[in-house]
């Protein structure tokens, strides 16, 4: 094999492998099972938690696997919780978030309307992991979501794209790779730092008035790099590094969104700031 072809294949594998780490570690078979305790469209928000919470999975995720820990955590605290699948590709079961992100935002638009109609609420709160923390910003900014969303909580979101530890900067040196990614997994191409999608998303400001934004990151993120690129700039933004709450928290990109109860506690603080309590290492047992 010619050296450049070997390098091309290696880079392709590295890119897809790095992107695959966005997937939760739970078995994909769980996606075939119904969610328990959430996605209950008979749930009516309470006076203490008047808005339904919509969970938005990350790349290679789905509406069940991504939320096997966080959804019950929120349900047990009195929230009406819902989750959707989006960004599906033909003949690719379980692993979603791979389609064009603009189309995924349209799917979110339809789903939020469905949740609001079922619950009778005027607004929803959105909590997303990785792409799921970034994609709703397109919905809020361009599809009228600002009128329907009170708060967006992004867990390790790639709000300004990612370099995948610098790998994406090598794409111009390998003819065909970028075209291959765009054609086969447009949702990945959209997340590359400097992509047309990311550029348009952030033009004119990161945020929209009337929506509260919270970003929770980890300094051990190996997918959204640099990790502070997930931060947003705006008067209605709280940017958090989870290690500032607990220096012992070693969560990386996947764990922070799927397993980390310290992060979960910070999510509830963002959803209900009036009743917020300090997040510490002890929050893991809260």
Model segments located where?
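Glycine-rich "HGGG/HGxG" loop immediately N-terminal to the catalytic nucleophile
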Residues: 85-98, 163
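Serine-dependent carboxylesterase/thioesterase catalytic core
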Residues: 56-57, 81-84, 102-202
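Extracytoplasmic/secreted proteins, especially bacterial periplasmic and envelope-associated proteins
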Residues: 51, 55, 65, 69, ...
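Composition-driven, intrinsically disordered low-complexity tracts enriched in small residues
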Residues: 28-47, 117, 160, 165-185, ...
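Second-shell loop/turn segments in exported
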Residues: 58-61, 93-99, 186-188, 251-257
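Secretory targeting and sorting signals
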Residues: 1-30
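Short, surface-exposed "cap/lid" segments of acyl-processing enzymes
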Residues: 41-90
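C-terminal catalytic-base region of ester-bond hydrolases, centering on the histidine
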Residues: 174, 207-286
């Amino acid at each position: 094999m010619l050296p450049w072809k070997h390098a091309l294949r290696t880079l392709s594998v590295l890119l897809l492998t790095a992107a695959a780490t966005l997937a939760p570690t739970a078995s994909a078979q769980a996606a075939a099972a119904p969610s328990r305790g959430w996605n209950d469209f008979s749930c009516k928000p309470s006076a203490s938690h008047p808005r339904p919470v919509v969970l938005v999975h990350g790349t290679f995720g789905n509406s069940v696997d991504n939320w096997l820990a966080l959804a019950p955590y929120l349900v047990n605290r009195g929230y009406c919780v819902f989750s959707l699948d989006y960004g599906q590709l033909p003949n690719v079961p379980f692993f979603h978030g791979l389609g064009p992100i603009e189309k995924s935002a349209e799917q979110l638009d339809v789903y939020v309307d469905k949740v609001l109609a079922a619950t009778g609420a005027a607004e929803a709160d959105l909590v997303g992991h990785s792409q799921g923390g970034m994609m709703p910003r397109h919905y809020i900014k361009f599809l009228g979501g600002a009128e329907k969303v009170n708060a967006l909580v992004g867990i390790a979101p790639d709000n300004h794209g990612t370099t995948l530890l610098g790998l994406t900067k090598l794409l111009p040196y390998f003819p065909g790779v970028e075209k291959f990614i765009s054609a086969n997994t447009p949702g990945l191409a959209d997340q590359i730092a400097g992509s047309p999608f990311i550029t348009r998303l952030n033009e004119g400001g990161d945020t929209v008035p009337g929506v509260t934004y919270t970003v929770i990151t980890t300094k051990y993120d190996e997918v959204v790099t640099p990790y502070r690129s997930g931060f947003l700039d705006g008067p209605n933004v709280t940017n958090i590094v989870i290690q500032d709450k607990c220096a012992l928290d070693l969560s990386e990109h996947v764990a922070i969104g799927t397993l980390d109860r310290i992060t979960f506690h910070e999510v509830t603080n963002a959803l209900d700031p009036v009743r917020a309590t300090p997040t510490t290492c002890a929050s893991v047992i809260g």
